[in-house]
Amino acid sequence: MPLMKTKPTSPGRRSMVKVVNPDLHKGKPFASLLEPQFQKAGRNNNGHITTRHKGGGHKHHYRVVDFKRNDKDGIPAKVERLEYDPNRSANIALILFADGECRYIPAAKGMTVGQAIMNGSEAPIKSGNNLPIRNIPVGSTIHCVEIMPGKGAQVARSAGGSAVLLAREGVYAQVRLRSGEVRRVLIDCRATIGEVGNEEHSLRQIGKAGANRWRGIRPTVRGVAMNPVDHPHGGGEGRTGEGRVPVSPWGTPTKGYRTRRNKRTTSMIVQRRQKR
């Protein structure tokens, strides 16, 4: 997919770079796979802000994407069209099964309209096909990897994402993630062959603040620009630094401080992710 740099007709368009994909469907999405998505603006049921910097943005429907792909084993399908999805960085593909049912799946790299798709242990090792890890050759590049069998894909789902199947040992397989972490997963978990498409997504440039507001992203204010009542870094006469170890608004150390508390799955991590 080519990158398009806009002409500098305004300051906002001077540095804007878009990802252009002429193969995307230009009509409306598949109506029966849409659900209403109500804007929460980062608030919970009490109205309290639980996620900062969210609010506004364009209205859009949620596309029901099939991340499990475990109930159509052995039924051939083909790609009807590729579509834009405002809810994720990757594009999605509408596939039509031989029994007449349509599903949305994440579009794999190189996926084209009319391509044959298959799910199940008997599916060929081809980009876009979904298989149990026990049936995938060691060394294969995979994406949309399950952590628990039947729960649906949780790993390597964003644009350009992928993982590598390193080994199989008994009922577990070792998978190397893009972060460098090597993790054990059950061989009954499923994964999709290939990489996630729209890999140029990371090369786009927003160009102006308003483009982020369209996406529902509000401004991020620095702590040193706040008052002491609002942030531990706030206050001072004139421009000042933090004056202490950098912390979050609630006093938790930041900039590299580890906050992982999920000890239950620590034994599944063979190698921690690499430092950046």
From Swiss-Prot:
GO terms for biological process: cytoplasmic translation. GO terms for molecular function: rRNA binding; structural constituent of ribosome; transferase activity. Keywords: Ribonucleoprotein, Ribosomal protein, RNA-binding, rRNA-binding. Residues 230-242 have a biased composition (Basic and acidic residues). InterPro entries: NA-bd_OB-fold, Rib_uL2_dom2, Ribosomal_uL2, Ribosomal_uL2_bac/org-type, Ribosomal_uL2_C, Ribosomal_uL2_CS, Ribosomal_uL2_dom3, Ribosomal_uL2_RNA-bd_dom. GO terms for cellular component: large ribosomal subunit. SUPFAM superfamilies: Nucleic acid-binding proteins, Translation proteins SH3-like domain. Residues 224-258 are annotated as: Disordered. It comes from the Bacteria. Coiled coil: none annotated. Part of the 50S ribosomal subunit. Forms a bridge to the 30S subunit in the 70S ribosome. One of the primary rRNA binding proteins. Required for association of the 30S and 50S subunits to form the 70S ribosome, for tRNA binding and peptide bond formation. It has been suggested to have peptidyltransferase activity; this is somewhat controversial. Makes several contacts with the 16S rRNA in the 70S ribosome. Belongs to the universal ribosomal protein uL2 family. This is Large ribosomal subunit protein uL2. The gene is rplB.
